[in-house]
Amino acid sequence: MVDHEGEDSSPADGFGHIPVLLHRADELLGPALTANDPHGGGAVMIDATLGLGGHSEHFLRTYPQLRLVALDRDPHALEIAGGRLAPFADRITFVHTRYDGIEDALTQAGLSPRESVHGILFDLGVSSMQLDESDRGFAYSIDAPLDMRMDPTTGITAAEVLNTYSHGDLARILSTYGEERFAGKIASEVVRQRAKEPFTTSAALVELLYRTIPAATRRTGGHPAKRTFQALRVEVNGELDSLRAAVPAALDALTVGGRVVFMSYQSLEDRVVKQEITPRSKSKSPEGLPVELPGMGPEFRILTRGAERASEQEIEENPRSAPVRLRAAERIARRSAA
């Protein structure tokens, strides 16, 4: 999945997309999936962001005895991926839920939400399918209804946010979720514009942003709509709140030796991931002790040095991988009763 630029199997699969960092994800998750059997026998993997199923198809083909629990909040994605993964249907449990629904998804699959999973993959952001479907409103380059819901069956739309939120709330989400320097100015223009005519399509919003953001910033800061569209999407879908709940649930679900890979596409997501996994990768014993106190050692080992980025070659083959930041961790000890 991606953030206003896209998704990565190299080369592109028959579904017209390339699942991002596929081979690196396999390098990291493979040892956990094959710890007991080279074919993945007895191993359980969660694809927390199924999308079009490119990553899942690779893992199911590579490990012919692997069991998969596949989550997605977008019913259309589940439908498409379900058809794509039909040859492996006897090894998959599909669950229509956000990625913070991991506990319920595991229960639905007949598994414990605690220490029962060997590999978990998060490919965050908006998917290529959602970007490319012109009626979803995710892409600022296409005039479309201002929807932006990843699950179009529930929740508020981006148009409702623009037309009903107060100036203060609009400025807050633009600043917090979009890291937009001109949040207050944009919010003022939105309030002024909607008093004349409510926002319904992306073109009207993009036009306002071109008028509002100074020309000098437009020349050097990328597309003027990028940050505002990101902020609206994060707000509409509750992405950061969902991620803050999902990361601890994913860590709790891993068995000893189990691994998780997170692929983020903007700094806010990556920051949440880092903030959640770092404390559980450190000792809780007082500094200076010559031994580790029982139950006080780190639960996890960080597998990446900082956040890894796509190589120049991958970016050339798949430009939508350019913003990706990958982090991974392995459970090395059971969680203490405390």
UniProtKB/Swiss-Prot annotation:
Cell location: Cytoplasm
Family annotation (SUPFAM superfamilies): Putative methyltransferase TM0872, insert domain (SSF81799), S-adenosyl-L-methionine-dependent methyltransferases (SSF53335)
Function summary: Specifically methylates the N4 position of cytidine in position 1402 (C1402) of 16S rRNA.
UniProt family annotation: Belongs to the methyltransferase superfamily. RsmH family.
Keywords, comma-separated and alphabetical: Cytoplasm, Methyltransferase, rRNA processing, S-adenosyl-L-methionine, Transferase
Chief location category: cytoplasm
The keyword Ligase belongs to this UniProt entry's keyword annotation: no
Cellular component annotations (GO), alphabetically ordered: cytoplasm
HAMAP family, sorted: 16SrRNA_methyltr_H
Taxonomic superkingdom: Bacteria
Annotated spans, Disordered: 277-298
GO biological process: rRNA base methylation
Binding site for S-adenosyl-L-methionine: G53, G54, H55, D72, Y99, D123, Q130
NCBIfam families, per the entry: 16S rRNA (cytosine(1402)-N(4))-methyltransferase RsmH
Single GO MF descriptor: rRNA (cytosine-N4-)-methyltransferase activity
Catalytic activity as recorded in UniProt: cytidine(1402) in 16S rRNA + S-adenosyl-L-methionine = N(4)-methylcytidine(1402) in 16S rRNA + S-adenosyl-L-homocysteine + H(+)
Documented EC number(s): 2.1.1.199
Enzyme class, spelled out: transferase
Protein name as catalogued: Ribosomal RNA small subunit methyltransferase H
